[in-house]
Swiss-Prot record:
UniProt keyword DNA-binding, yes or no: yes
PROSITE patterns xref list: DNA_MISMATCH_REPAIR_2 (PS00486)
GO molecular function: ATP binding; ATP-dependent DNA damage sensor activity; damaged DNA binding; mismatched DNA binding
Cysteines paired by S-S bonds: none
Name of the protein in its database record: DNA mismatch repair protein MutS
Keyword annotations: ATP-binding, DNA damage, DNA repair, DNA-binding, Nucleotide-binding
InterPro entries associated with the record: DNA_mismatch_repair_MutS (IPR005748), DNA_mismatch_repair_MutS-lik_N (IPR007695), DNA_mismatch_repair_MutS/MSH (IPR017261), DNA_mismatch_repair_MutS_C (IPR000432), DNA_mismatch_repair_MutS_clamp (IPR007861), DNA_mismatch_repair_MutS_core (IPR007696), DNA_mismatch_repair_MutS_N (IPR016151), DNA_mismatch_repair_MutS_sf (IPR036187)
Gene Ontology CC, one term: cytosol
PANTHER family referenced in this protein's UniProt entry, alphabetically: DNA MISMATCH REPAIR PROTEIN MSH1, MITOCHONDRIAL (PTHR11361:SF34), DNA MISMATCH REPAIR PROTEIN MUTS FAMILY MEMBER (PTHR11361)
Transmembrane feature ranges: none
Amino acid sequence: MSAPKVTPMVRQYLSIKAEHPDSILFFRMGDFYEMFFEDAEKASKALDITLTSRNKNDPDPVPMCGVPHHSANGYVARLVEQGFKVAICDQVQDPSEAKGLVERKVVQVVTPGMQLDGRYLDASQNNFVCAAVTGRGGVGLAFLDISTGAFLVTQVTTPESAFQEILRMGPKELVLPEKFEENARAAAAMRMADQLPTSRLEGKDFENARTRDRLLEHFKTRSLEGFGIQDLPLAVRAAGALLHYVQQAQRQEITHVTKIQAYFQDQFLWIDDNSARNLELLKNIRNGTRQGALISVLDKTVTAMGARLMSYLLRYPLIDPQVINLRLDAVEQAKDLARVRDEVREALKEVHDLERLRSRTALGHANGRDLAAMGESLKQLPRLWALLKENFESPLLCGEATDDGLTDVADLIDRSIREDAPPGVRDGGMIKPGFNEELDEVAALATDVKGLIAGLEAQEKERTGISTLKVRYNKVFGYYIEISKNQTKSIPPHYVRKQTLVNAERYITDELKEFETKVLGAEERRVALEYNIFTQIVDRINGENDRLEKASHLIAWVDVLAALGHVADHNGYCRPVVDMGQTLDLQESRHPVVEKMLPGQRFVPNNIAMNNLDQQILMITGPNMAGKSTVLRQAALCVIMAQMGSFVPAEKAVVGVVDKIFTRVGALDNLSQGESTFMVEMQETANILNNVSHRSLVILDEIGRGTSTFDGLSIAWAVAEYLHDYKDHGVKTMFATHYHELTDLTKTHPRVKNFNIAVNEWNDEIIFLHSLVEGGTNKSYGIQVARLAGIPASVIRRSKQVLQTIEDSEEARVAYSAKASGKSGKKDVQVQMSLFPTPGELAAQALERMDINVMTPLEAMNVLSELQQRVKRPEKAPADVTAETEDQE
């Protein structure tokens, strides 16, 4: 575009756009936000709105599109959801006061991690943005949720651990240094950057001194020691950079972020992303929703704050029995006091999302409806606090926050804010009558102009005695008094003639001019005055930010603990004994999700007992559909529930604290990375073997399925041995398998115990009993299961024939292998698998390759005799029969 064609407005737009090249610029023009050039083309396509142009007759028109300012939030949310950043550029000057171009500037940058509008956020999940930085000693991570004020930091030793931590926390956006990928290992581990919207900051924004000073300035402190992060330099660097990023996006200080909390991975039960997915903690594998996941059973919270805390507790179970039992004490009280618990939950139902309301208020994004919701929530506190203090003893249920009912804040909102306040803060209609005398007067002028004019007219008629006197208005003279000419002799001396007409005279008075000043612009003054009063109320509320934060925190905990008590009561859960022992003993345990998905049916409970003395590895065999996977998962879920502080679905439960849970359940191809099902399976298994400890719980559901039978069996056998012998202590493991040969491990490994899922056979049918019983089984019932699945009868019949042939052949193979191998050492597999074909297999191969059409009868008889002799003498090393027969051919 040539310079002469650039208008001042376009020049202003281009200047602001140059500062935000990676964002779609919402440029405020009157009642619309306009977008131009490439932004308009992108936004029109993403939002499905009309793309038009500015200066259509120009040979090079400017593409443009726009959205109404009052509905802009919805359009912004849609763009952000599609991965765009949006820079909101507002008019920061009253157009009536502008002597030229209205001043504009970007007031907010909205990104996936910077959303504040609760309508476009998942109420049950935090909306974190994460910053990561590498350095000597590992990786520093910081997570900040601008919508709640939560600010968490940690430091880990490896990029792989950082990657897993990011997956577990689930941020919506990443912030990385520009040269982050120069660390090749970090770049590989942090491939999350390819899956999440990622912003880059200059390296200097992550520097030690700069980030530390930024945190000290924000928290108004001289040291970071009080936050416990002074010895975490990488975490400090990540936190300082993230704070800078958020402040830049919001264009202001984020005063509602009042603390920063350090945490460490070894404080919590480690559940990697693969295990969390396999166990379906937060979403099911089928379609990624909550239905059918553990969270759907446990999350009976009634507030958004409680739902977010429940999700966090499920992702971060504890490993400290003392803290776990403190939670269990509170849940037990909530379970036992059902009537009080229900009253508490009823009160909580009236509480809105105080955390996000507090944040919106602090950042200047709250409207009248937000304050009304906050006031309605705070009204519940006196009743709620009284119920807690009078009935519960747990400090988690009646903390010090119960001494503060925030009645002063609730009263302020109740007196000032209308319940039916409009969504806009500059439209008026927010403040209740009677709260401000000046506003009441201005509002009266704005809403009752006709009545005031009639009153003034009646007053002047009475004062002058002129019955034809009228008070009128036009745009030229404003308000005036009109008197017919035949009565002008009676006008008072303070009337000033303004205009002479044929039949009347028009006058003004000082009182009328004062009235005009009040009435004209009364609506504008009312709206402006309301906004000023509203901001004063907001400032007073923001002054109580710490009190609101404490109340929100306690409400979330009360909601979670009451919900867990409710679930335990209604589902028949028991309180687990959680200690530092090495025992896992679940009596009559059930799968918490599956039992809820069997309406009208009884879930078959099972006893699961493990320890480090004589029953550490449970080798579980049995047919498909019998329930092996269910038993495995329910054990892991019971441990997770116990260590998060929940009761568990069992008659009795003893849980020696577990530090890590690993699962290897099923596998999917990772074709985009060139990885097969078997490779994925082996990677998951390698992760387990390289990271277990003697306090871990390992769940293995079929190892070695993605390769040949003998390879798979060999790997499964070796994995089981490794876990049994791990550092002389072993690892508690539940190992489901169809390799019945693995049951022989009990002969050489004392802490391996065989179990199977019982079935009954009747008339060639199988009945699944779903009971875990001691002992192994050598039957898989695969053909029966195939028949249940609807495989055609002809295929079933043929399957039985093939199975019989294979079983007969296998019996011969086992007999030969046992005879050939002799006695084996303690660590040897009891049935050795030959690496070479047996003589019988070689004979079969030779027969298959022979061409009898070119052989004489005598040659055929000689070859047949030779093959027969070799099969009869298996103890002799197999010769290359194939080569010999080829020579004879």
